[in-house]
């Protein structure tokens, strides 16, 4: 793809100026998780379900995950692990305080890397599917961080796993259309609301129990970065959202007295794979319409599961290793929802520095973030990497 011509007399595209990530302290290794799950849910006698779950975990390509839930929390709140028991109040009371706190940890890391006074934050975007409250998690984070009470807030609830790309689109719009804006974006998920006891009638729970994980990400976005003061990581060039036709049954979640019930169709990888070339082609038409060499790009693909990642790789004809960062996050963190694609970008830019690459995008100039979630909704963001000083 030919480089875009930049007119330095005009506002530049928004840029990611810093990235921070955080996880709860409790790490669960996948090889040990089946023992934990069947013990705490009092299902050790269910050898049939245990065999199914063991196979799902083996195929998950996840080595470890981080969760807020502990055995102590579950023992104190048996309604959480009793399938169908009314437990929404217990879950929400926990999450409405813990989700903003996890977001705060990621935000403080991003702000530290950015290196500017917190008073320069003009906009806040908070995204979560874990809790619902008024005033919301955005309001709580303003207090936790000590942000200006006049900061412009945007709260996104229940968007799901594609929203890690959505927030980049919104931050881009805010940064490019408000002179001097510095946008703090925070995505935080604690999947306690999705935790359930086991049952023969709802086997989707086994898949979620093998993949879902907790984490928070924060990015700071602004246009026209201050020379020698702000150090951009990626430029946000173009964004696009689309719904895959006839796929609304693919990922469904409903808030109920028992928490979030969810349904995960085995057709999701097929839907994504069958449409990935089309939606990437249309995304890049917004840039210059010329790029069809997918191997010339770096990728941050939502790690919704190994079959989804495999389908993206296969249908785009990607070379081995092109999705290294995506597979690394799936292995070491699991599916954290919206924060996942930011974890991937963070890993990518750090690995690029470690390996002496010329850019933050694995030595490549152009790349793309692909968020995938309920709808099925696909949100893409075209990024341009930044040079790494020698």
UniProtKB/Swiss-Prot annotation:
Q: Which CDD domains match?
A: CHS_like
What are the UniProt keywords, alphabetically?
Acyltransferase, Transferase
Top EC class of this enzyme: transferase
Q: How does activity depend on temperature?
A: Optimum temperature is 35 degrees Celsius.
| One Gene Ontology term of the molecular function aspect | biphenyl synthase activity
Which reactions fall under this protein's catalytic activity? benzoyl-CoA + 3 malonyl-CoA + 3 H(+) = biphenyl-3,5-diol + 4 CO2 + 4 CoA
**Expression triggers:** Up-regulated by elicitor and by endogenous H(2)O(2).
Q: How does activity depend on pH?
A: Optimum pH is 6.5-7.0.
Protein's GO biological process: phytoalexin biosynthetic process; polyketide biosynthetic process
**E.C. designation(s):** 2.3.1.177
**Catalytic residues as annotated in Swiss-Prot or TrEMBL:** 161
Family designation: Belongs to the thiolase-like superfamily. Chalcone/stilbene synthases family.
Q: Which PANTHER family would you find in this protein's record? A: CHALCONE SYNTHASE, HYDROXYMETHYLGLUTARYL-COA SYNTHASE
Function, as annotated: Type III polyketide synthase involved in the biosynthesis of the phytoalexins bisphenyls and dibenzofurans. Can also use salicoyl-CoA and malonyl-CoA to produce a diketide intermediate yielding 4-hydroxycoumarin after cyclization and enolization. Can also use m-hydroxybenzoyl-CoA as substrate, producing m-hydroxybenzoyl diacetic acid lactone as a derailment product. No activity with p-hydroxybenzoyl-CoA, CoA-linked cinnamic acids or acetyl-CoA.
Subunit and interaction comment:
Homodimer.
Q: What is this protein called?
A: 3,5-dihydroxybiphenyl synthase
Organism this protein belongs to: Sorbus aucuparia
């Amino acid at each position: 793809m030919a480089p875009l011509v930049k007119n330095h007399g005009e506002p530049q595209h928004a840029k990611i100026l810093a990235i921070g990530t955080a996880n709860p302290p409790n790490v669960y290794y996948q090889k040990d998780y089946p023992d934990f799950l069947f013990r705490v849910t009092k299902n050790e006698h269910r050898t049939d379900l245990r065999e199914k779950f063991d196979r799902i975990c083996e195929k998950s390509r996840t080595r470890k995950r981080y969760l807020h839930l502990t055995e102590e929390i579950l023992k104190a709140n048996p309604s959480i692990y009793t399938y169908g028991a009314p437990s929404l109040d217990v879950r929400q009371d926990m999450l409405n305080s813990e989700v903003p706190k996890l977001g705060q940890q990621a935000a403080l890391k991003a702000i530290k890397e950015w290196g500017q006074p917190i008073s320069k934050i003009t906009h806040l975007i908070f995204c979560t599917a874990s809790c619902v409250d008024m005033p919301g998690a955005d309001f709580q984070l303003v207090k936790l961080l000590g942000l200006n009470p006049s900061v412009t807030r945007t709260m996104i609830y229940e968007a799901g796993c594609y929203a890690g790309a959505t927030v980049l689109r919104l931050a881009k719009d805010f940064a490019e259309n408000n002179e001097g804006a510095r946008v703090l974006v925070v995505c935080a998920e604690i999947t306690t609301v999705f935790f359930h006891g086991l049952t023969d009638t709802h086997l989707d729970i086994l898949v979620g129990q093998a993949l879902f994980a907790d984490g928070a990400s924060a990015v700071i976005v602004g246009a026209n970065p201050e020379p020698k003061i702000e150090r951009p990581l990626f430029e946000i060039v173009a964004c696009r959202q689309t719904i895959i036709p006839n796929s609304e049954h693919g990922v469904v979640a409903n808030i109920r007295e028992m928490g979030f019930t969810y349904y995960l169709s085995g057709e999701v990888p097929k839907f994504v794979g069958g449409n990935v070339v089309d939606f990437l082609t249309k995304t890049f038409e917004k840039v210059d319409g010329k790029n069809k060499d997918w191997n010339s790009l770096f990728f941050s693909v939502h790690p919704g599961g190994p079959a989804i990642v495999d389908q993206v790789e296969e249908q785009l004809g990607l070379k081995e290793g092109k999705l290294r960062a995506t597979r690394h996050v799936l292995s070491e963190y699991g599916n954290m929802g919206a924060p996942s694609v930011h974890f991937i970008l963070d890993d990518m830019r750090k690995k690029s520095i470690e390996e002496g690459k010329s850019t933050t995008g694995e030595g490549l100039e152009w790349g793309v973030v692909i968020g995938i979630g309920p709808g099925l909704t696909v949100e893409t963001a075209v990024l341009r990497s930044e040079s790494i000083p020698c």
